[in-house]
Structures are given as C-alpha cells and as structure tokens.
UniProtKB/Swiss-Prot annotation:
GO terms for biological process: activation-induced cell death of T cells; anoikis; apoptotic mitochondrial changes; behavioral response to pain; cell differentiation; cell migration involved in sprouting angiogenesis; cell population proliferation; cellular response to decreased oxygen levels. Changing E17K: Loss of membrane localization. This is RAC-alpha serine/threonine-protein kinase. Residues 150-408 form the Protein kinase domain. Changing Y176F: Significant loss of interaction with TNK2. Loss of membrane localization. Significant reduction in phosphorylation on Ser-473.
C-alpha cells in the first residue's frame, strides 16, 4: 500500500489507560491500520507527522458495550504476547457504528493484503509445504507440545487476561516462563480474532537481549506462550543486594537495553512500553534479557481516589499519565528510570500516594546524588525530560541519538550486539538449570498451579474454537 490515506477522522472520548477518566481526543484512522489521537484537531500535515503512539488496528478485536458509558467500543489486540486495550465512547449508536465499521474494514483489508503476500511468498496458495510454512514455523515441532510436558513451579504474574507461570520442561530440565492467555479474551463469541500475525512477529524476533519464544501452542480454552526464563537472576535482586551499581556496570546494562529497544523500534515497529527493573533479568553469563511476561495487574487501587491503575505507576512517562498519545520516546523515559535506579540506588520519583507521585512525575525537577559524574547526569537529564519531543531519543534518530551520547563514548555498538563486551558481573551459575538465584520456596518442591485438564492435550481438537487458530503451534527447537 504505497499511499497512506485517512479513512475516517473525528472526535472520540478516550478512557485513560492509567487514570480512568474520559478525555476528548481527535482521532485519525488510516488505511495502513494506524489509529492516532490528538488533544486538538491537527491543522496541517506537519502536525500530523509528529510521532505519536504506535497503536494499530491490524488483527484487532472490536467489542461494543453500554458500560461504563452508553455507545462505548473497545479495541483489543495482542502486541507481542501482551493484550492491549483501548476504550472509547461516542454520543450516538450511529456514530459508534460508523467508527467500528471503518476500523473493521481497515483491519479486514490488511488481513487480506497479508494473506495475498503470504500466498505470493509461498508460490502457491494451496501448497502448504512451501515458504509460507517455513515462515510461520522455523522448525516444525516433531510432536505436538502439550501442557503435560511441564512441571508448574511458581506463579510469576496474574492479570485480567491470564497468568504467567515458571515452568520446568520435564524432558530437558530447562526453565521457562509460560504465559497462558484465556482464549475467549482474544476470540470474541461472534468473530475470529487474528492473533497469528502477532505470533509470527514474535517467532521471527531474534535479538540477543530479548526473551525468545521457545514454543507456542493452544489447548481447548487457552493460548500458551513458552518463553526463555534467564537464570542469572532478576536485575532487581542484584541491585537490592548491592544497593547501587558503578557507572561502568550501569553503562554495560544500559547499552544492551538500548540495543534491544533499537531493534524493536526500527525492525519490528513495536514500542515496548513496559521497561522497568522487574522486567530485566540476567542470563547465565551476565547479559541482559528483557522479558515479555507482562500482564496488566488487576486492582491496583489508590485508597484515596479509588482510581485503578494498570502497571507500575513509578515508571510511567508524563505523556502516558496525561494520556497524550505516545510513541517510542516512552521507552527512553523507562530507560532513564532504570538507569537512574542503577546509578543512584533509588527511583527518581516516589511517593506512596499515587496522586502525589503523578504530580512529581509531571512537575518535579530531577535531582542527582553529588557522587554522580557529569556524563551520567547529562544522560539521565536527557532521558527524563518531561516533554517527549525534547527527550533524548525523542527525535527521528531514536536510539541513534542515545548511542551517540558522551556517556556511551567508546562503546562499539556492533560489539554490544555480538556480546563481545565482557559482562561486569557473572552470575554464579553452572548451567541453565542451576536455580541458585530462584526463590528457595519454589525450587524446593513442585507445586501444581494449573493442573492440566484431561482435554488440554493437543490431541483433543475443539471443533468450535480450534479453526480460529490455524497453525498456532511453534517450536524453536531447531535454533536452541
């Protein structure tokens, strides 16, 4: 699709993702799937070109509801393995019908276009053994993976759409994080959701500092993603133990994070959105692994206001809090927060009261310990600029701007990617099955968190749901 055109535009009320209030936003829906909102109606093309959020209606699921307000509609899609939702309402049922029809039409058009491209790449629509099959599954599973092949050790996270469990593969003794999403969340009762392209993006993502997908499969009611679980321990654990990292150590971790985010932004067109200390782990050699175990936490409530938040408020960028639609620069704010924690031993902004915390994030100037060097101060000041357009990395150069900052002078970025830099700390683990950095409580004994149902075996084909997810199984065994 060479020419990107606006399919529909107009005012919508958008519900805040974190502070659940409704705000008027002027939205543009384009035929390439882009769906972006502005505080005010953009008057000219230049304003429209400003980098905004990367929300796409490709492979989305649309739902209509009369709650919490009449004429509400929800757009839901999988970004990576995380369910992303946006909630809108309009004044009349007719208006809602116009918007949902336009969005569905764009989504269907993109799906058709992609299917045609897939047919073209595979040479023949009917030949399933060709390039298409290779594209979808790098190494076809020798057998169907099932839930029975894992021991279930610990609940790592639980949310509205599913859960993440630390599992051990019985055959190899290796540890993985299994993200289990409820299928009905993604397959609406009346329609088929298109999760497979997103699944393919994940399968084809290869970066040394991103958690790799090992398997994905389905049961009668769940989609399961089995991802690497690095056993060098959480960075949070190591930082709590040492209180603060040297600038050199922080530079090493920061460089690996920048390399991974650069890949997501430039190669995959994905904004990670969820960079925080808990999502950073070390592998057995001491290199960074950014995890994708995220689930929207349920019911994080602030007693004073009873507004519900999704995620960790301390890490939220100002533009996310204000619900200005946002782009790649949110990830550089997240980088600023985690690097500040590493070098200063505390969060840049903190208050137990969420309202006060948000005020600090939006208004408070950043302060540094006297011990911090000038390059580190300059880097953190740049990354923690309130205005995303002024932020380091907020321009069109994105990650390149950060790579060229003097804090990273002397870093050869190709060497970072190739893991040629020597990690400043090597975890004391002997192999990928060494559990010394795991909590003792769950390595000492196996606990069954999710006993697999009898019909969770892949051999049981659920005739009603199954056709919606053709080829939803994947194994990276060929690359392990």
């Amino acid at each position: 699709m060479s020419d990107v055109a606006i399919v529909k535009e107009g005012w919508l009320h958008k519900r805040g993702e974190y502070i659940k209030t409704w705000r008027p936003r002027y939205f543009l829906l384009k035929n390439d799937g882009t769906f972006i909102g502005y505080k005010e109606r953009p008057q000219d093309v230049d304003q429209r070109e400003a980098p905004l959020n990367n929300f796409s209606v490709a492979q989305c699921q649309l739902m209509k509801t009369e709650r919490p307000r009449p004429n509400t509609f929800i757009i839901r899609c999988l970004q990576w393995t995380t369910v992303i939702e946006r909630t809108f309402h309009v004044e009349t049922p007719e208006e809602r019908e116009e918007w949902t029809t336009a969005i569905q039409t764009v989504a269907d058009g993109l799906k058709k276009q992609e299917e045609e491209e897939m047919d073209f790449r595979s040479g023949s629509p009917s030949d399933n053994s060709g390039a298409e099959e290779m594209e979808v599954s790098l190494a076809k599973p020798k057998h169907r993976v099932t839930m029975n092949e894992f021991e279930y050790l610990k609940l790592l996270g639980k949310g509205t759409f599913g859960k993440v469990i630390l599992v051990k593969e019985k055959a190899t003794g290796r540890y993985y994080a299994m993200k289990i999403l409820k299928k009905e969340v993604i397959v609406a009762k009346d329609e088929v959701a298109h999760t497979l392209t997103e699944n393919r993006v994940l399968q084809n993502s290869r970066h040394p500092f991103l958690t790799a997908l090992k398997y994905s499969f389905q049961t009668h009611d769940r989609l399961c993603f089995v991802m690497e679980y690095a056993n060098g321990g959480e960075l949070f654990f190591h930082l709590s133990r040492e209180r603060v990292f040297s600038e050199d150590r922080a530079r090493f971790y920061g460089a690996e994070i920048v390399s991974a985010l650069d890949y997501l932004h430039s190669e995959k067109n994905v904004v990670y959105r969820d960079l925080k200390l808990e999502n950073l782990m070390l592998d057995k050699d001491g290199h960074i692994k950014i995890t994708d175990f995220g689930l929207c936490k349920e019911g994080i409530k602030d007693g004073a206001t009873m507004k519900t938040f999704c995620g960790t408020p301390e890490y939220l960028a100002p533009e996310v809090l204000e619900d200005n639609d946002y782009g790649r620069a949110v990830d550089w704010w997240g980088l600023g927060v985690v690097m500040y924690e590493m070098m200063c031993g505390r969060l840049p902004f903190y208050n137990q009261d969420h309202e006060k915390l948000f005020e600090l994030i939006l208004m408070e100037e950043i302060r540094f310990p006297r011990t911090l060097g000038p390059e580190a101060k300059s880097l953190l000041s740049g990354l923690l600029k309130k205005d995303p357009k002024q932020r380091l990395g907020g321009g069109s150069e994105d990650a390149k701007e950060i790579m060229q900052h003097r804090f990273f002078a002397g870093i050869v970025w190709q060497h970072v990617y190739e893991k040629k830099l020597s990690p400043p700390f090597k975890p004391q683990v002997t192999s990928e099955t060494d559990t010394r950095y795991f909590d003792e409580e769950f390595t000492a004994q196996m606990i069954t968190i999710t006993p697999p149902d009898q019909d969770d075996s892949m051999e049981c084909v659920d005739s009603e749901r199954r056709p919606h997810f053709p080829q939803f199984s994947y194994s990276a065994s060929g690359t392990a």
